[in-house]
């Protein structure tokens, strides 16, 4: 295979890796935790990954405490946990 062909193959494999969604086996374990509002009362919207619904869902977060299945943006939740 020529060097141009190898570069093209490497580029395609890299693109595939970037665009392939997170699979359940690659998903961090904390994505399986239930949403936890935490112990404070500075309520704001946050997102958690729902294993039941298989998507990121908004919930009310108290501003402190809670667990790792807590994201400020939908995009952050999806890129970390969503399949």
Swiss-Prot record:
Tissue: Expressed by the venom gland.
Alphabetical list of SUPFAM superfamilies matching this protein: BPTI-like
UniProt xrefs under Pfam families: Kunitz_BPTI
Keywords: Disulfide bond, Protease inhibitor, Secreted, Serine protease inhibitor, Signal
Origin superkingdom: Eukaryota
Record-linked InterPro entries: Kunitz_BPTI, Kunitz_BPTI_sf, Prtase_inh_Kunz-CS, TFPI/VKTCI-like
Any one GO cellular component localisation term in the record: extracellular space
GO molecular function: serine-type endopeptidase inhibitor activity
Domain (BPTI/Kunitz inhibitor) ranges: 31-81
CDD domains attached to this UniProt entry: Kunitz_textilinin-like (cd22594)
TM helices/strands, residue ranges: none
Subcellular location: Secreted
First and last residue of the signal peptide: 1-24
Family per record: Belongs to the venom Kunitz-type family.
Purpose: Serine protease inhibitor.
Name the UniProt record assigns to this protein: Kunitz-type serine protease inhibitor textilinin-7
């Amino acid at each position: 295979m020529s060097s141009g062909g190898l570069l093209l193959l490497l580029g395609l494999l890299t693109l595939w890796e970037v665009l392939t969604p997170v699979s359940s086996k690659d998903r961090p374990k904390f994505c399986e935790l239930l949403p936890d509002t935490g112990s404070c009362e500075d309520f704001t919207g946050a997102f958690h990954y729902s294993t039941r619904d298989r998507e990121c869902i908004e919930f009310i977060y108290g501003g402190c405490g809670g667990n790792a299945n807590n994201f400020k943006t939908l995009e952050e939740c999806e890129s970390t946990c969503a399949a």
